[in-house]
Swiss-Prot record:
Domain of life: Eukaryota
Membrane topology: Multi-pass membrane protein
Family as reported in the entry's similarity comment: Belongs to the Cold-regulated 413 protein family.
Membrane side Cytoplasmic: residue ranges: 65-74, 120, 166-179
Biological source species: Arabidopsis thaliana (Mouse-ear cress)
Location within or outside the cell: Cell membrane
Name of the molecule in the record: Cold-regulated 413 plasma membrane protein 2
Gene that this sequence comes from: COR413PM2
Extracellular topological segments: 1-43, 96-98, 142-144, 201-203
GO cellular component labels: plant-type vacuole; plasma membrane
Pfam families the record matches: WCOR413 (PF05562)
InterPro entries, per database record: COR413
Length: 203
């Protein structure tokens, strides 16, 4: 009887060890899967942030081009709301704070009392700073960074692209004319960010 009890206890110990080992293996598999998913999501998030920076600078680049001899017929004023919606949070918070308020104040004073000293090329940047400073909380925190703002950015990019292609005389000319290539590439960069952001959001 004692031998049977001993064998039963030994069998129970073996079963317990096997069960613990099995649980440990499952934990290892779960940890590896969690690490893989976190790495994947982190990479996707980094991609969105990087493309957001790229899109914002592309929009600023197009604004600068519009004030040079490379001026196009497209409605570049739409780049202002695009920059507002796609500007990275770090830069947005900096420009919508006291720094932006001082810049906006100086711009308004110059425009009102010294119009001759207020160059035309400052109209767009001044409008952007004013928009960043006076935008309501709802627009700044509930439209920016959400799928609504991303969709609006996508529509702006698509509209600017089709307007640019039409002004260039066709799709081929937009890539072959010296003045058209730089604008075309800039607008394509405007489209990459919202498209990728929507894909990541769906995933």
């Amino acid at each position: 009887m004692g031998r049977m009890d001993y064998l039963a206890m030994k069998t129970d110990d073996v079963d317990t060890v096997a069960l613990v080992n099995s649980d440990m293996e499952e934990l290892k598999v779960a940890a590896k899967k969690l690490f893989s998913d976190v790495s994947k999501l982190g990479g996707l998030g980094f991609g969105v942030s990087f493309l957001k920076f790229l899109a914002s600078f592309a929009a600023i680049y197009l604004l600068i081009l519009d004030r040079t001899n490379w001026k196009t017929k497209m409605l570049t004023s739409l780049l202002i709301p695009y920059i507002f919606l796609s500007l990275p949070s770090v830069i947005f918070n900096f420009l919508s704070g006291d720094v932006g308020k001082w810049i906006a104040f100086v711009a308004v004073v110059l425009r009102l009392f010294f119009p001759k000293h207020f160059p035309d090329w400052l109209e767009m940047p001044g409008s952007l700073i004013l928009l960043l400073v006076v935008s309501p909380h709802f627009l700044a925190h509930h439209i920016r960074g959400t799928w609504i703002g991303t969709v609006i950015s996508l529509f702006i990019g698509c509209y600017l692209l089709q307007e640019h292609i039409r002004a260039s005389g066709g799709f081929r000319n937009s890539f072959t004319q010296p003045r058209g290539v730089s604008n075309t590439l800039g607008i394509i960069l405007l489209l990459v960010y919202p498209v990728w952001a929507l894909i990541v959001r769906v995933m």
